[in-house]
Design a protein with these regions (language model features):
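Short, surface-exposed ligand-recognition loops at beta-strand->loop->(often short) alpha-helix junctions
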Residues: 2, 57-58
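NTP-dependent nucleotidyl-transfer catalytic core
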Residues: 16-19, 26-48, 53, 60-349
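Generic start-of-chain signal for non-secretory N-termini
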Residues: 1-27
């Protein structure tokens, strides 16, 4: 047992002994609330205001209560006590107590102070989840530090926690990645090509194209463009994910699972949409499929399937929430960037 908790029990026993001795009246005494490390060492290793806390119940001055508590303390944990001010009790730990605790710290290692396992809750924490189309920025770094710290704290508190990175490897942004790599590859091969309007212009795209050219040469030039784009999509995704993992590992952030958005299509997405339709949470308008998010306070309903039949990013997000729940997690924590604040109401729907 931690010294602080053990000392609280000792104070409670001293109070009961004082009641049994007739020095304190019987009553509904609250448990010891505060047992803190004083700011100054001269006030001991721990200090409590329990006597002041119990003054109203005991109908006595806090100093008198403190004197009774100190009188009935029976423990080798402390070498001496001191009553200060209006009734604070300061405790000075015995050297053997300190050394014993140090031994426990060394024996337990990083798990020292961890709470017993919580068998009731399973928590999934999803964070960072930057698109695998470029480099991490300072906003991602903030989310990585915050999320990693939260995961570590929850585990220390006894929770069963899974840390997860949601890989956005489906949708238009991955198509634009492939198109951008393709344009840079063609340019490096001496051909005219332009980055698409919604493409990526960073140096990292040029580097990816250079790596492909250095490894495979010009063999992709003879391919049908559609086939070449599919290959560049996979090669680009692999390289970007490898870069993301490397940067995060250097930041001492590791994930238990990297979840692919693609794995949700088509079955899990279709199932999620069916559930929402059956519950009358969706409707068709202007050739698109909409989710009724206004009923939960959103400023407008949101498109899930566009008029051209292409799902929005929100569509797979809906299926992803259901996937987490089906995996047995009853508490979900999503750590997003500041630009995602509008998604909160949508996902709650």
């Amino acid at each position: 047992m931690e010294v602080r908790e053990e000392l609280k029990e000792i104070i409670e026993k001293a109070k009961e002994a004082a009641i049994a001795a007739g020095e304190l009246p019987e009553g509904d005494y609250a448990a010891v609330q505060r047992l803190e490390v004083p700011k100054s060492k001269e006030f001991g290793d721990y200090s409590t205001n329990a006597a002041m806390q119990w003054a109203r119940t005991a109908h006595k001055a806090p100093r008198m209560i403190a004197e009774s508590i100190v009188k009935h303390l029976d423990t080798p944990l402390v070498t001496r006590t001191e009553i200060a001010g209006a009734g604070f009790i300061n405790f000075y730990l015995a050297a053997d107590t300190v050394y014993s605790e140090l031994k426990q710290i060394l024996k337990a290692g990083p798990s020292y102070g961890d709470l017993p396992k919580n068998k009731k809750d399973r928590i999934l924490v999803e964070y960072v989840s930057a698109n695998p189309t470029g480099l991490l920025h300072i906003g991602h770094a903030r989310g990585a530090a915050y999320g990693s710290a939260m995961v570590n704290l929850l585990r220390a508190a006894g929770y069963d926690v899974l840390s997860e990175y949601y890989v956005n490897d489906a949708g238009n942004q991955i198509d634009h990645l492939a198109e951008s790599i393709n344009a840079r590859y063609l340019q490096l091969c001496g051909l005219d090509a332009e980055i698409p309007e919604d493409g990526y212009h960073g140096q990292d795209i040029i580097d990816t194209a250079k790596n492909i050219l250095a490894k495979d040469g010009k063999k992709y030039l003879d391919m049908d463009e559609k086939e070449r784009l599919e290959i560049f999509k996979e090669l680009g995704l692999q390289e970007k994910l490898a870069d993301l993992k490397k940067d995060l590992q250097e930041f001492h952030v590791d994930f238990d699972n990297w979840f692919s958005e693609r794995s949700l299509y088509p079955d899990q997405v279709n199932e999620a949409l069916k559930v929402l339709k059956d519950e009358d949470n969706m409707y068709e308008k202007d050739g698109a499929l909409w989710l009724r998010t206004t009923k939960n306070g959103d400023d407008k309903d949101r498109v899930v399937i566009r008029t051209n039949g292409v799902p929005t990013y929100f569509c797979s997000d809906i299926a992803y929430v259901g996937n987490k729940i089906r995996r047995g997690y009853n508490k979900l924590i999503d750590i997003w960037g500041a630009d995602h604040h509008g998604y909160i109401i949508r996902l709650k729907t």
